Amino acid sequence: MTELAGASSSCCHRPAGRGAMQSVLHHFQRLRGREGGSHFINTSSPRGEAKMSITSDEVNFLVYRYLQESGFSHSAFTFGIESHISQSNINGTLVPPAALISILQKGLQYVEAEISINEDGTVFDGRPIESLSLIDAVMPDVVQTRQQAFREKLAQQQASAAAAAAAATAAATAATTTSAGVSHQNPSKNREATVNGEENRAHSVNNHAKPMEIDGEVEIPSSKATVLRGHESEVFICAWNPVSDLLASGSGDSTARIWNLNENSNGGSTQLVLRHCIREGGHDVPSNKDVTSLDWNTNGTLLATGSYDGFARIWTEDGNLASTLGQHKGPIFALKWNRKGNYILSAGVDKTTIIWDAHTGEAKQQFPFHSAPALDVDWQNNTTFASCSTDMCIHVCRLGCDRPVKTFQGHTNEVNAIKWDPSGMLLASCSDDMTLKIWSMKQEVCIHDLQAHNKEIYTIKWSPTGPATSNPNSNIMLASASFDSTVRLWDIERGVCTHTLTKHQEPVYSVAFSPDGKYLASGSFDKCVHIWNTQSGNLVHSYRGTGGIFEVCWNARGDKVGASASDGSVCVLDLRK
């Protein structure tokens, strides 16, 4: 049968930008209608035996989930809004991962079966199952065309077999009259042909792409990996508590969870389930929306979460809901505490950013400066922050100011992530335009325009080294993760790439430095977490999980790495000797 890449929850990838979605949006435009209402589509098989009804809401939801699972976060948000996913009555927690891929695969198998069956219901004699690509299967008259091609090939094979039989009979007759010396030469030639034929077949079988084999010397043994299960959908994010071994995770099952991995916890790891609910008819009911962002405050006493339901929430470390923050008019994409712990900053698909008072839960100020969804935010200090958007702009805003104090323009596609360096002097940004740019508040244009990746750059991280860090004697570095399957380390002072890390085989969605800056963790949709030496660029540890990796993070001591995955699992890697 046909094998689809991504038949599991680890789906294939394409660029996360808006351009990658145009064909999908166009294809389903007729089903949604301009207002995104639900329509019924009556379908039947080509021969008219079976009929069924499919609503456009159902189609839209499966496409939306596929985009999320594939890592197309920006496109998923846009598509969800345009198709009014939030207004549908579909309970997303009941839909299994990779549902769209699964139903497409079943459709392919149905077409393959049709090709193998005659009009009268009998199976072609000796016919192998025909392997199709998805594009082959949607072509007009594919069944009739493939059946006709098979009949012609079968006729040729029968004619060739008859000719070969006649030739063999003639050769056998001639062999009885030839000399013994000549007859001894032929078997050697025949044996050589047989051996070469087997070699050729073996070569063709082994010529398929395989997952990279992990070197046994760097592979993290299963005894050092703890797999935490409990989430019922993909886990988009995870973050360690800054003072203890509590790992928070956020999922498409509308929950966040706090996993206790402290050595003194009884019975191994335990989990607290933080259910994200909304008020309906005087009752709290599950929101059925993804938890898209989370962040611990500096002293580790409070956890903030952002959800696709448009609400930010503050939780205590023991799992109690402390506050619900509601002013965004759509999904929340990013959320950050300031260092002091008195404000929370959020970015929304409603094109705004909001500073919240963490104590009262009130919005201190809303900043409506972007012309498209805001994708990321980062604090420069306790009252000043930067935000980026699909509008290709970066704004630097300050609490109390009614306009941006600085606007950086230069990217030619949506800006995916922004990060201030530890000193707050330099701002790094990465974009779907495949560039990494470094900005200074002292000038209008970027001070570095770094162009080395050949696909979209999804995220960036500064090392915790250099001035204003606990590792002042180590040089500062910047790491970038791209859809080209590579991670790059940069010397920002010189504006050069010092290492290109190339072991991943799928887009890389997350990178994180160890607290001392000596190691870098990377997570990719190839299901692998790699640990690299930042000085040499060498791979020192590697782990292959069971789902595509969305996020990686280090605990405060630097001896454990957490990773969240598309199959609903959360992995904890113990790097102690």
Curated annotation (Swiss-Prot):
Pathological condition linked to this protein in its record: Hypothyroidism, congenital, non-goitrous, 8: A form of central hypothyroidism, a disorder characterized by sub-optimal thyroid hormone secretion, due to insufficient stimulation by the thyroid stimulating hormone of an otherwise normal thyroid gland. It may be caused by congenital or acquired disorders of the pituitary gland or hypothalamus. CHNG8 is a congenital, X-linked, relatively mild form which may be accompanied by hearing loss in some patients.
Organism domain of life: Eukaryota
Any single GO BP term: proteasome-mediated ubiquitin-dependent protein catabolic process
Residues spanning the membrane: none
Keyword Transcription regulation: yes
UniProt xrefs under Pfam families: LisH, WD40
Effect annotated for changing V111 to N/Q: Reduced interaction with NCOR2 and GPS2. Abolished ability to repress transcription
Subcellular location: Nucleus
Record remark on domains: The F-box-like domain is related to the F-box domain, and apparently displays the same function as component of ubiquitin E3 ligase complexes.
Segments of this protein annotated with the region Disordered: 177-202
Tissue specificity note: Ubiquitous.
Single GO MF annotation: transcription corepressor activity
Functional summary from the UniProt entry: F-box-like protein involved in the recruitment of the ubiquitin/19S proteasome complex to nuclear receptor-regulated transcription units. Plays an essential role in transcription activation mediated by nuclear receptors. Probably acts as integral component of corepressor complexes that mediates the recruitment of the 19S proteasome complex, leading to the subsequent proteasomal degradation of transcription repressor complexes, thereby allowing cofactor exchange.
Descriptive protein name: F-box-like/WD repeat-containing protein TBL1X
WD repeat feature ranges: 230-269, 286-325, 327-366, 369-409, 410-449, 452-500, 503-542, 544-576
LisH domain residues: 55-87
Residues the record lists as N6-acetyllysine modifications: K153
Gene Ontology CC: histone deacetylase complex; mitotic spindle; nucleoplasm; nucleus; transcription repressor complex
Assembly notes: Homotetramer; dimer of dimers. Component of the N-Cor repressor complex, at least composed of NCOR1, NCOR2, HDAC3, TBL1X, TBL1R, CORO2A and GPS2. Interacts with GPS2 (when sumoylated); leading to protect GPS2 against degradation by the proteasome. Component of a E3 ubiquitin ligase complex containing UBE2D1, SIAH1, CACYBP/SIP, SKP1, APC and TBL1X. Probably part of other corepressor complexes, that do not contain NCOR1 and NCOR2. Interacts with histones H2B, H3a and H4. Interacts with MECP2; recruits TBL1X to the heterochromatin foci. Interacts with USP44.
Positions of modified residues (Phosphoserine): S183
Key words, A-Z: Acetylation, Activator, Congenital hypothyroidism, Deafness, Disease variant, Isopeptide bond, Nucleus, Phosphoprotein, Repeat, Transcription, Transcription regulation, Ubl conjugation, Ubl conjugation pathway, WD repeat
Lineage: Eukaryota, Metazoa, Chordata, Craniata, Vertebrata
PROSITE patterns (UniProt xref): LISH, WD_REPEATS_1, WD_REPEATS_2, WD_REPEATS_REGION
Stated consequence of mutating L94 to A/E: Does not affect interaction with NCOR2 and GPS2
Gene3D superfamilies: 1.20.960.30, YVTN repeat-like/Quinoprotein amine dehydrogenase (2.130.10.10)
The keyword Chloroplast appears for this protein: no
